[in-house]
Structures are given as structure tokens and as C-alpha cells.
Regions:
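Short, conserved micro-motifs composed of acidic
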Residues: 1-295
Length: 295
């Protein structure tokens, strides 16, 4: 389903959902404000409802404003590209984290983040400037961060070896999380079970499930979405999510979410298929993780 009320004739992709419910705020990257040039992070909202009487599923979406997200947008957006928003709550220190992929003046992509405690009594956090995730930084393009369910391991995309691949690194639990993120660069490891000889990008983890995009052979065309399950200490061989999700065009930067009262999860992703409003649009679909993971 095309989220047409938050899409535009420009490119809208790289979304993230900070909270779950039947009214879901969604942060995503769009180049509409620069008429197709630079990408910035903006905010929308999705509504969905399942009528248990007649079995009808209703989906709607629109642009939205939110005081906290407006503060975040004002802090991070600039004349270069901001992509790949990713929200994280760290229960170990009680702080929220907003990660994103930032284009530098030189054109390379870097990972940056904001860190804050939950706003109290309507008082919004103040940010001087985003911090560089320097522990993952390199002279290549680094972006699209995600963490496993225990925040014990971080995964991200980089082209430091040529093609884009998915890298991983263990999180040092012995030091403050912010200090670890801002620490000196360390070597990340290629995940052999996830990567191919082609481009593998934009990982997103929900519980023990990972979705990502790849242009490896055997797909439906362009970039397709792939799925992997973490079991017995390792990720399974990825498999294509099939024609209900993928097309001969490009499917990109997926995320998985969940809403109370629904049996299935949902997946939101970007695609440049021709039935959209123009460029890349955001799409929504239901997904049964257990059934998908048992294929």
C-alpha cells in the first residue's frame, strides 16, 4: 500500500518509527523541500485500523508536526543529505538515541547521533550539535545503523571494501554508551552469512529478525528486500521476501514494526515502482515474522 498522503513527487525513503501504536509517527528522508536536490529528515504519521466485524483493513497517512521531532529536525538538517533515521531507547541508561546518516561537505556519508533523556513536563531537550559515531567511522561511506535486541552488537552499511556490505561490531558494555559511540575508530567485521559479492545495504533488526536490501542475483530486479533470522548464535542465510513485497524495480531501506492488538507485524519500505507519486515512495505491508522465518 502506497502511503500517498505523506509521499510526494520527489524521493521519500529511509523511514524510522520511534513509537508503536495504531497512530504511528514516522520520520523519513525526503528531497521535496529542495525540489529534488538534498535530503532532509521530516515527519509524518500513519493510521491503521482492522475492523474485526467485516475484516476490512484501513490505512491512512499524512504529514505531521511534533515538538520533539521538530527540535531534532532543526538540529540535524542542513544543506547536505540526511538519510537513514534510526531511533533507539537504551534501557541500560534510560536515554533515547536518534541516529542518522549524514553527508559531509566532501560528499562522504558518516553516522551521527543525538542523545537525550525523555522530555519531562513538556521541556524539550537542547542539542548543541550532533555527535559523530566515530568508533564506526572511516574514510569511506558509513551509514544505516541498527542494533540487536540486547544492544550487544551494532550493524551498519559501509563500502570500505568496495561494494556496500553489512558490518558488525560488539558493543563494549563496560563503558558509558555515549563514550563508546564517540570512541576512537575500531575495525568492524564483515558478516559472511549476510553479505554477497554484490551490494548489501540498510540492515534493520526487530527482535531476532533482520531485513535489508540487496542487488544480488536471483531477485526480481534492481534492489530487493531480504530476510534473515538470528538462531543458535548466528544469522541464517538470507532469503528474498518474494513478489508480494519485491518488484522489478528497487525496494529499499525496510523497517519492521508492531502494533498492539494486531497478530502480524508490518513492514515499511521505499520503492521507485511506477505506481507511486514520483521518485521513491514509502510503502506499507503486513508481515507474519514467524511464518516468514520458517520458510
Amino acid at each position: 500500500m502506497n502511503l500517498e498522503k505523506i509521499n510526494s513527487v520527489y524521493d521519500d525513503y529511509n523511514c524510522n518509527i520511534p513509537m508503536i501504536g495504531d497512530e504511528v509517527p514516522i520520520l523519513f528522508a525526503s528531497n521535496r523541500e529542495s525540489s529534488g536536490e538534498d535530503f532532509n529528515i521530516i515527519t509524518g504519521v500513519i493510521w491503521f485500523l482492522f475492523n474485526q466485524t467485516d475484516g476490512e483493513f484501513t490505512l491512512d497517512s499524512d504529514m505531521a508536526t511534533n515538538e520533539l521531532y521538530s527540535v531534532i529536525e532543526d538540529t540535524i538538517n542542513n544543506d547536505f543529505d540526511q538519510l537513514g533515521p534510526y531511533y533507539l531507547f537504551n534501557s541500560n541508561n534510560g536515554r533515547f538515541y536518534f541516529f542518522y546518516t549524514d553527508e559531509s561537505a566532501g560528499g562522504d556519508l558518516d553516522l551521527r547521533f543525538l542523545s537525550y533523556f525523555p522530555p519531562a513536563f513538556g521541556e524539550m531537550p537542547y542539542f548543541e550539535s550532533p555527535d559523530l559515531v566515530s568508533i564506526l567511522s572511516s574514510s569511506s561511506n558509513d551509514g544505516y545503523i541498527t542494533f540487536d535486541r540486547d544492544i550487544a552488537k551494532v550493524y551498519f552499511t559501509s563500502d570500505r571494501a568496495g561494494n556496500y556490505d553489512i558490518y558488525e561490531m560488539e558493543v563494549n558494555q563496560g563503558i558509558d554508551f555515549d563514550s563508546w559511540l564517540k570512541g576512537a575508530e575500531q575495525s568492524a567485521v564483515l558478516n559472511d552469512s549476510l553479505n554477497s559479492d554484490y551490494n548489501d545495504k540498510c540492515p534493520f533488526i526487530y527482535q531476532d529478525f533482520m531485513v535489508f536490501t540487496s542487488d544480488r542475483p536471483g531477485g526480481f530486479g534492481g534492489f530487493d528486500l531480504y530476510f534473515s533470522v538470528f538462531n543458535a548464535g548466528k544469522w541464517s542465510d538470507p532469503f528474498n521476501l518474494g513478489p508480494s513485497i519485491n518488484t522489478e524495480y528497487n525496494e529499499y531501506r525496510p523497517l519492521i514494526g508492531f502494533a498492539g492488538g494486531f497478530t502480524n507485524n508490518f513492514i515499511v519500505f521505499s520503492s521507485d515502482r511506477p505506481d507511486g507519486l514520483g521518485g521513491y515512495d514509502l510503502y506499507f505491508a503486513g508481515i507474519d515474522l514467524e511464518e516468514t522465518g520458517n520458510k
